[in-house]
UniProtKB/Swiss-Prot annotation:
Subunit structure and binding partners: Interacts with host fibrinogen alpha chain/FGA. Interacts with host complement protein C3.
Extent of the signal sequence: 1-29
Species name: Staphylococcus aureus (strain MRSA252)
Cellular compartments per GO CC: extracellular space
Transmembrane segments: none
Location relative to the cell: Secreted
Main location: secreted
Identification of the protein by name: Fibrinogen-binding protein
InterPro entries reported for this sequence: Efb_C_sf, Extracellular_fibrinogen-bd_C, Sbi_C3_db_domIV
GO molecular function: complement binding
Organism domain of life: Bacteria
A Pfam family: efb-c
Keywords linked to the UniProt accession: Secreted, Signal, Virulence
Amino acid sequence: MKNKLIAKSLLAIAAIGITTTTIASTADASEGYGPREKKPVSINHNIVEYNDGTFKYQSRPKFNTTPKYIKFRHDYNIVEYNDGTFEYGARPQFNKPAAKTEATIKKEQKLIQAQNLVREFEKTHTVSAHRKAQKAVNLVSFEYNVKKMILQERIDQVLKQGLVR
């Protein structure tokens, strides 16, 4: 009987100990992530300035061989690593526009010419201007399909008005 009582009391103590450690560990884990009161604003010579006006010197010891990985990305392109240090992140990459080839330049010129001829047809309402504008719109490349449809609609609107001389 004494052994059963001792076993039950040990199990109860173990259960209480396990629950308290899990509660404490979840509380510690919730502190590390999520919104922070202090956010880094700038970094200058390993001195981090926070938004509340405080400063902190940061150093990563040479013997620390654990791999660095990004833990959190802050505003102002500042990155926080798993060892608690801060650095500026990589600069955003901008894709330079590709140089235009002769073919694309010719296609754009045909589009501009078609726009000018449609504009002229809208002003004059003549049969010859209509033929020139329609031919130019038909020669516009399929790459400018949306603009081509808009030009065709403009020609159709003028034809619906009537009075083509």
